[in-house]
Every structure is written in structure tokens, then in C-alpha cells.
């Protein structure tokens, strides 16, 4: 650890120390740095060129052998330890015959031309990745069978920095649900709850493919790209925005979500529904998931007496039920404990790079169809309900059962969790828009036994209703009768 601290202190390039590091490389002619490097092809010069995140120098030539060995540099960039060298082209062009006549060597003049990466005196002499350059996904999936379901869930939580000891299964699932936007494409998650529950930890600390918008502030151009940006001269960020360059975009405080562009919410709704958006004359598609986080300043029961659970959103959103209908799952943040030292693990888990790369690679897979092997969704589901539940189910299954080896009861567990998250959205829509969203009794039917039909409820509203509004399962009935003490009571009979 002391060696690691020393290397980081001496070699890590801080943005405010870039010029000092450049000077040190120039003076010493060779120096080792730690920085994030990204490579791309310069098709006009037929070379690979590299740029650095913190070291403020012009693009340099990236040797082809490094790109072939570590292709990750071409897509997302990679943190590396690099041996940098400094020598000018003039130093290579000295007059080799000058010493024959006892004359001092004089550098030859360099032909005038536009300077390019080849002319940059900074060179990459050697390179070693300090994050996983590639992931053997099949190997990780193959290890799943060595763990029980509980052990695997605990491994995931410890890999994210949480200590699962003492947690109930439902609490563990809440923490796992926070990872679903990292592993599922075009997934829309909302989590509102008390302060201090670590809502932003996963997106800020665990995955380099997620970006956290502090205060929820952004612009339409930042989120979706500039209008009519030139394909040749604009960067990828300028053309497609955050949703085209990140796997997950998180709005850290929904109360601060304000857009000056009046069309921003319409663009956002279109993207949340289909993963596409238009900027000027061009149409783009992206697969970034969206997370909306915020605080609820009162108890859930008090909030529900006067308004709905989307109330922390700004007024321009609260008047738009179509926006909230596009949210796939509402995570009940009030059920998550406030972060304490005993909730932070000191046990081993997967290294952060491994967990984040696992999630990124698993985004390519689709597990939504696994519901159909065991259950059928009931008639209260509309298209958006089904999309939301299937994507939540798929994301949870990718995390907990990546080998696709799942039994009926485990499938029931994550299906009921997924339905509850979507029903919580619909219950708020029923409060906001009334009759349009009355079909809230989401549930499922056993594929082998159609008589086994179940409705899934949300905990915060079931507490206030003695007899649920939804149709009961066959063989279940509520009745009023006298007790042995001659008092009237409500009884539930189950056959």
C-alpha cells in the first residue's frame, strides 16, 4: 500500500499540475505518468493517435502494437501507467559528418509543414494498463454455479462497497436494483427517499460508464447534442450528447431539473419511450439508461394523504403524467437504511473494474423472455407496463442469475419485485390522472396452473387498506364475524 501511495503521489497527473509534469518530462527526457489515454485512427496520416485526460499536450502517436493489444483504448479510453519520452525531430537530424572536420554538430533545419502527431516531441515509449483491458465474460458467468443465490447477491453487494450482513432480502434487492440501469439498456429508474441513503454511490463511484449530474442541472444540448452539429468537425459529445456517450445518466436531484428549452421535456419523453431523438434534421438512437433521484422531506404516509410520490419533481414535470408513465420502476428509497459505517464492507469482492465491465458486457444480452417460461402477465398490463416489468426482470436476472439457470420460485421473487416497482408508478399516475390509469392491479398467472393468479401490491398503500381493492385469489375471501369475546372482527379465509 505504501508503494501504491508513493506511485500515485509521484506519477498521477493532476489537471492543475499538467504543465509541471510536461516540464519534468522535457527535463528528464523520460518520465512515468498515470493518466487515462484514448486512442483513435487518423485516417489522413494512417496512424493511431492518443489523447490524455489530464496531461494537456497535443495528440501524440500511439504505437500500433499497444492498440492491437488493448483495443479498449479505441472506445472508452483506459487508465494506464505510461513511460513518456521527450525528443525533438531536430535532435535526430544532426549532421553526422560534422565531427570529421572537428566542427560542432548543428541540427539540420526541419522542412516547414503543418505540425502533426508525428512532430510532437512527447512520445509513448511503454504502456501498462492499470484497469482491466478486457473481460472474459463467459468465465465470470461460469463461476455463478459455485455460489448459492444468497452468496452471489452478497458478492455483488460487497463488490459495490456494501456490507450485506444483517440485511433482509428485500433491502438487498433494493441495492441490487440500483445496479439495473448499468446492466440494462434504455432503462428508466426513479428513486426518491430520505437524504443520506447513498442514492448516488453506485453511479458516482462504481462504474466509469455512468455520469452523475449534480443538482440535476443540464441543458438540452448537453443531454442530446447540439443542433445540426457537423459530423466531421464536431466531437461525439457535441453530436449525440450525454445519452450517446454514457451507459447511464443520473439526475442527482430531481427538484433542480429545469430546462430553458421548452421542447426539452418532449425530447426527453421521446427518448425514454423509444431510445431515439432528433436534433435538427438528424435522428439519433442511443441506449443510455436514465436515473432520477431526489429527496422526500416527509413520511410516505403523510405525502400520500395530500399528494403523490412524484411530488419532488419540478412543476413542469408534475403536470405531465405521460413523462412519469415512461418510468419503468420506482425504487422506494424510504425503505433503504441511511448509510453508516457498518453498512460499508471490509470484505473481499470483485474489483470495481470487473463489476463495471461485467455490467457493460451484459448490456448486450436480453433476458426479458425468461418470464414466459414460468408465468403470464395478467390483463391489467398495458404495453408500457409490460416493457417496464420485463426490463426490470431482465436486469435483475442478469445480475443475480447471469448463467440463466433460474428456478420457478427465484423467477417469482424477482418478477414480483419488478411488478411492484411498476405498480408504484401506476398508483401515482392514478392519483394524478384518475380514470386513465385505473388498471393498477398488476399481477401474473402461473403458466402451468392458470388457476393460480396473483396480484402484487405496493407496501405503502396496502398498509392503509384493510381489504385490498383488487380481486382476490381463488379460494380467498374476507368476512365479518363475531369473536369468542362477542366482538365484531374482519377475517380472511384461505382455502
Where are these regions (language model features)?
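Extended, charged/polar low-complexity intrinsically disordered regions
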Residues: 1-160
Amino acid at each position: 500500500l505504501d508503494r501504491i501511495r508513493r506511485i500515485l503521489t509521484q506519477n498521477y497527473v493532476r489537471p492543475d499540475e499538467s504543465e509541471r509534469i510536461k516540464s519534468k518530462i522535457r527535463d528528464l527526457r523520460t518520465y512515468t505518468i498515470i493518466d487515462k489515454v484514448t486512442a483513435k485512427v487518423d485516417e489522413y496520416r494512417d496512424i493511431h493517435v492518443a489523447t490524455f485526460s489530464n496531461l494537456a499536450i497535443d495528440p501524440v502517436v500511439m504505437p500500433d502494437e499497444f492498440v492491437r493489444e488493448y483495443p479498449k483504448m479505441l472506445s472508452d479510453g483506459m487508465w494506464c501507467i505510461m513511460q513518456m519520452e521527450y525528443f525533438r525531430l531536430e535532435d535526430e537530424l544532426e549532421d553526422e559528418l560534422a565531427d570529421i572536420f572537428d566542427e560542432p554538430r548543428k541540427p539540420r533545419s526541419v522542412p516547414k509543414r503543418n505540425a502533426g502527431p508525428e512532430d510532437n516531441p512527447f512520445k509513448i515509449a511503454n504502456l501498462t494498463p492499470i484497469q482491466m483491458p478486457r473481460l472474459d465474460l463467459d468465465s465470470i458467468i461460469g463461476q455463478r454455479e459455485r455460489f448459492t443465490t444468497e452468496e452471489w447477491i452478497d458478492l455483488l453487494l460487497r463488490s459495490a462497497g456494501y456490507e450485506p450482513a444483517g440485511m433482509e432480502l428485500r433491502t438487498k434487492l433494493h441495492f441490487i436494483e440500483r445496479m439495473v440501469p448499468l446492466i440494462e439498456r434504455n432503462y428508466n429508474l426513479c428513486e426518491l427517499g430520505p437524504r443520506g441513503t447513498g442514492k448516488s454511490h453506485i453511479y458516482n463511484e462504481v462504474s466509469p460508464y455512468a455520469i452523475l449530474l449534480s443538482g440535476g442541472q443540464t441543458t438540452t444540448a448537453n443531454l442530446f447534442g447540439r443542433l445540426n452539429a457537423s459530423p466531421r468537425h464536431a466531437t461525439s459529445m457535441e453530436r449525440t450528447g450525454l445519452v450517446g456517450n454514457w451507459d447511464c445518466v443520473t439526475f442527482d436531484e430531481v427538484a433542480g431539473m429545469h430546462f430553458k428549452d421548452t421542447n426539452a421535456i418532449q425530447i426527453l419523453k421521446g427518448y425514454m419511450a423509444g431510445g431515439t431523438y432528433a436534433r435538427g434534421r438528424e435522428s439519433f438512437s442511443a441506449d443510455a439508461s436514465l436515473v432520477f433521484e431526489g429527496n422526500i422531506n416527509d413520511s410516505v404516509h403523510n405525502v400520500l394523504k395530500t399528494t403523490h410520490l412524484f411530488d419532488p419533481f419540478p412543476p413542469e414535470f408534475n403536470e405531465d403524467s405521460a413523462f412519469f408513465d415512461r418510468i419503468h420502476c420506482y425504487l422506494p428509497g424510504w425503505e433503504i437504511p441511511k448509510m453508516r459505517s457498518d453498512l460499508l464492507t471490509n470484505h473481499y469482492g470483485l474489483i470495481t473494474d470487473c463489476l463495471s465491465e461485467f455490467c457493460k458486457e451484459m448490456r448486450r444480452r436480453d433476458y426479458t423472455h425468461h418470464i414466459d417460461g414460468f408465468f403470464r402477465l395478467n390483463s391489467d398490463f398495458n404495453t408500457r407496463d409490460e416493457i417496464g416489468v420485463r426490463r426490470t426482470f431482465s436486469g435483475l436476472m442478469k445480475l443475480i442469475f447471469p448463467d440463466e439457470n433460474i428456478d420457478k420460485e427465484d423467477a417469482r421473487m424477482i418478477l414480483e419485485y419488478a411488478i411492484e416497482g411498476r405498480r408504484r408508478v401506476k398508483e401515482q399516475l392514478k392519483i394524478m390522472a384518475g380514470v386513465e390509469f385505473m388498471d393498477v392491479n398488476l399481477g401474473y398467472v402461473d403458466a402451468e396452473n392458470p388457476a393460480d393468479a396473483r396480484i402484487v401490491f405496493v407496501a405503502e398503500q396496502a398498509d392503509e387498506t384493510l381489504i385490498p381493492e383488487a380481486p382476490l385469489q381463488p379460494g380467498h375471501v374476507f368476512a365479518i364475524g363475531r369473536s369468542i369475546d362477542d366482538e365484531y372482527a374482519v377475517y380472511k379465509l384461505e382455502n
